[in-house]
Amino acid sequence: MSMNDPISDMLTRIRNAQMVGKDSVRMPASKMKKRIADILKEEGYIESISESVDEANHTTLELTLKYYQNKPVIEEIKRISTPGRRTYVGKAEIPSVYQGLGIAILSTSKGVISSRRALELGVGGELLCTVY
């Protein structure tokens, strides 16, 4: 089965795993998903990331989820730009997620970066998702 939006699939897997209290979540890997996972780890939303290759030579990402007082650290993870409706923002239009408590993840000319890093670099790009 082909997947139309792998990033939405990744975010949904994380959301569903946290709703049922799973320790980790596995998903097919890609460079974009790996970079998004790296940003989530850098910002403290997930515990760790591991990559593995199975017998069929398919790469899999495993994210260890993070909880605080038995509640998921990620309260909301939301896809903004979709394949059918791309959303682009300039450097002045980068949103402040929950008054700066959350982050947005953008795909820019400098790579996939967090909204904080995009503001430092002064670049805009495609608004992939928001995390709070």
From Swiss-Prot:
According to its UniProt entry, one GO biological process term is: translation
Q: Which InterPro entries match?
A: Ribosomal_uS8, Ribosomal_uS8_CS, Ribosomal_uS8_sf
Question: What Pfam family is a match, any one?
Answer: Ribosomal_S8
Which keywords label this protein? Ribonucleoprotein, Ribosomal protein, RNA-binding, rRNA-binding
Q: Does the keyword Ribonucleoprotein apply?
A: yes
Q: Name one GO molecular function term.
A: rRNA binding
Q: Which residues cross the membrane?
A: none
Entry's Gene Ontology cellular component terms = ribonucleoprotein complex; ribosome
Into which family does the record put it? Belongs to the universal ribosomal protein uS8 family.
The job of this chain, per UniProt, is described as: One of the primary rRNA binding proteins, it binds directly to 16S rRNA central domain where it helps coordinate assembly of the platform of the 30S subunit.
* Subunit relationships: Part of the 30S ribosomal subunit. Contacts proteins S5 and S12.
HAMAP family per UniProt: Ribosomal_uS8_B
What name is this protein filed under? Answer: Small ribosomal subunit protein uS8
Species in which this protein is naturally found: Magnetococcus marinus (strain ATCC BAA-1437 / JCM 17883 / MC-1)
